[in-house]
Structures are given as structure tokens and as C-alpha cells.
Amino acid sequence: MKIYLVRHGETDWNQAGRLQGQTDIDLDAQGFAQAAEAAERLKEVPFEIAFCSPLIRARHTAETIVGERKITLTTDERLRELNFGPWEGTDVRKIREGANSPFTDPGSYLPPEGAESFAQLYARGGEFVKRVLLPLE
């Protein structure tokens, strides 16, 4: 089995340097163009199935790549981005400069209240692989 991983296209928050996390932000014009470019690069890949996060930026990217293919695109909550809780919408530079930055020292990152730890992210991602992808082999 081959697995292709594609990151969603750009959003206004990416452009502004704001931390998105699980906030449901759509693609901007550049993001839609990036999705179209990814679709063009992957047009010869014979996908049998596709999965994405239910977040609109991921859905629009995946829908563009899937295009007219006669395959199922399934959203799964376990593919959502890390939940940064109260930090979502914050300037990423402020988070990077902080003492508890998930970007500079992920191993010692302690999520703020209402946010998700990397262990939780890995657990739900691993659960997706175990329950959804491995049975496809």
C-alpha cells in the first residue's frame, strides 16, 4: 500500500502568522491555487480511497485533488490538526518565543488548559492508522 500525505493549502491565518489548530479556516486564493497544483502533480496517481480532516481547509484541498475520480473521500476527526485551545488565533511568533513553545521544544511542551498534548495527537493519529489504514492492506 502506498500512502500519499498532502498538507492543506494556505489560509488567511497562515498568511497572517496566526496559529490555526482546529479553528475551521477555509483556504485563501493562494491555498486554492496550491490545491490545484497538488491535484495536477497527483493526477496520474491511481488513488483508490482518500481521507482528510473534516476541517474545511483540508476538505477543500482533498476535494480538489480527488476531482472527478470515482473514489470515496472520507473525513475523519482523528485527522484534525493539533488542538491548541486558547492559543488558536494567536500570533505564531509569540508562541515560538514563549518558554512553553510546541515548536521549539516539542518534548517538553505542556499544553495550556483546553488544548491537546502531542501524546494525545499521536494516540488519535495512531488509532486512525490502526483502525482504518492497516485493515486496508
Where are these regions (language model features)?
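A conserved pocket-lining segment of Rossmann-fold NAD(P)-dependent short-chain dehydrogenase/reductase
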Residues: 104-110
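Active-site/binding-pocket entry motifs
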Residues: 12, 101-102
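Active-site beta-alpha turn of Rossmann-fold NAD(P)-dependent dehydrogenases/reductases
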Residues: 7
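Phosphate-coordination/substrate-recognition cap region in phosphate-metabolizing enzymes
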Residues: 37-100
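Loop-to-helix element that buttresses phosphate recognition and phosphoryl-transfer chemistry
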Residues: 10-61, 111-126
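Active-site-adjacent alpha-helix immediately C-terminal to a catalytic or transition-state-stabilizing loop
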Residues: 12-13, 59, 68-70, 127-137
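Extreme N-terminal starter segment of soluble prokaryotic enzymes
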Residues: 1-4
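Short amphipathic alpha-helical segments with coiled-coil-like heptad repeat character
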Residues: 39-40, 102-104, 129-131
